[in-house]
Design a protein with these regions (language model features):
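Extended, charge-rich alpha-helical interface modules
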Residues: 2-85
Length: 85
């Protein structure tokens, strides 16, 4: 899990890891859709683009819900920020 999570209670570790995994997957899907829109995607998705767009939209909505929950429950998602930013 890494040092950045070691001082968090188990449930917060799971919460932060879930958010991080979702954010990473949404970023990758967004990159695919951006390349598709630009006509430079190097493969043809088997799933219709509309379904992929809907999936990304729902992923972003779920991220917003997790961010709101984090505020209510005192979970610091800034732990995921790149220290060089």
């Amino acid at each position: 899990m890494g040092d950045r999570f070691e001082n968090l209670p188990d449930w917060q570790q799971r919460f932060v890891m879930e958010y991080e995994e979702l954010a990473n997957r949404a970023e990758k899907l967004h990159a695919i859709l951006t390349k598709y829109d630009a006509g430079v995607l190097d493969f043809t998705p088997q799933t219709p683009i509309g379904v992929l767009r809907a999936q990304l939209s729902i992923m972003w909505a779920y991220m917003e819900i997790l961010e709101e929950r984090a505020e209510f429950e005192g979970v610091d998602l800034s732990i995921l920020a790149d220290p060089e930013e």
